[in-house]
Amino acid sequence: MILQNALVYTPRHTFEHGTIVIRDGRIVPFAAPEEGEEVLDAEGLYALPGLVDIHFHGAMGKDFCDGTEEAIQTLADFEASKGVLAICPATMTYPEEFLNKVMDAAAAHKNGKGADLVGINMEGPFISPKKVGAQNPEYVQGADAAMFRRLQKRAGGLIKLVDVAPEEPGNLDFIRECHNEVRISIAHTCTDYDTAVKAFEAGATHMTHLYNAMPGITHRAPGPIIAAMEHDAEVELITDNVHIHPAVVRFTFNTFGDDRVCLIADSAMSCGLPDGQYSLGGQAITVKGPRATLTEHPDTIAGSNTCLYDCMKRAVLEMNVPLESAVRAASETPAKSIGVDNDYGSLAAGRYGNVILADKELNIKAVIQKGVRII
């Protein structure tokens, strides 16, 4: 396939008029059309890399923790329809016996139709019982290296991120022991600045949904956010215009940079469906518009109801984040953060031919996956 006359988001993180050539599923340097090759005129359209979501839970009534092929395929199909072509869905806080079936289902899944399953984000259960958010406090436990390794074996090595509250007893030791086996993310935590620094020095490299379920910044208690800033950590950001004020979103891009900000959806099973009652992590949630909350605790946000593409779009159109930065934060940066950037997250030669064509209002006009138009 050849895409001509597009305004292409280049590996230099700028937009330039150009042509994208895709052969055998991957982007190649410019080449003349072959006989019978499909040529698509993208005049007036942006060509964006397929997005990479490293933290979401569900959509269309299915949750990754359903632990079934049907659920995974539903998520893969939905995400692909929204231009998200590589997914690393997140688990919730459950006991090992429950997580076993989730890992088994992920390991058995074969990529083909829909977004590629490229990893698993193990969001629980190694978190703080005081900062569970929408996680189930009943199953919170200390970080357990043997348990992680058993789950990783069942998952066939798919676990790319493990979330840890470093202040909990033994959790710093887990970071020291396991950081060379998996990326460690600071999450659902009450940690202070000094303990967060120890966590990053021990090998943590990532922070889960920045600002949410963690202490904030004050001038006498800088907390984990400043520690992350000082230690080159990559940070997740939910830009659904519910979780974080637009000014704080802009502040984060200005301080961390788009090479360290990973936009995420953190969406629940309600994403893509009407308002109503759903569940997340075994707890009832109520959805109204873009806002999802625990039904029994309506002041507690329970994931989002927005897909990653729409989070990126809102960051640009509602929060005044530059398009170039928002695109990078939804594609290349998350791909790098979990080590799949040789295949995903960029329109550089050698990467998969995953392309979104969008108009100037960022409405999706086409989605191309590995050189095949699927939307």
Regions found by a protein language model. Name each.
Residues 1-48:
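Histidine-rich, glycine-flanked metal-binding segment
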Residues 6, 336, 346-375:
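C-terminal cap of metal-dependent C-N hydrolases
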Residues 44, 55, 122, 178, ...:
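Conserved, mostly hydrophobic/aromatic
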Residues 46, 54, 64-116, 138-154, ...:
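Alpha-helical scaffold segments that flank or form the walls of functional sites
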Residues 57, 73-102, 115-128, 155-167, ...:
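Divalent metal-dependent hydrolysis catalytic cores, especially in the metallo-beta-lactamase
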Residues 77-88, 128-156, 198-210, 221-234, ...:
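Active-site gating loops and adjacent loop-to-helix segments of metal-dependent hydrolytic enzymes
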Residues 149, 153-274:
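Active-site core of metal-dependent hydrolases
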Residues 224-235, 253-265, 271-351, 355-357:
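His/Asp/Glu-enriched, well-ordered alpha-helical/loop segment
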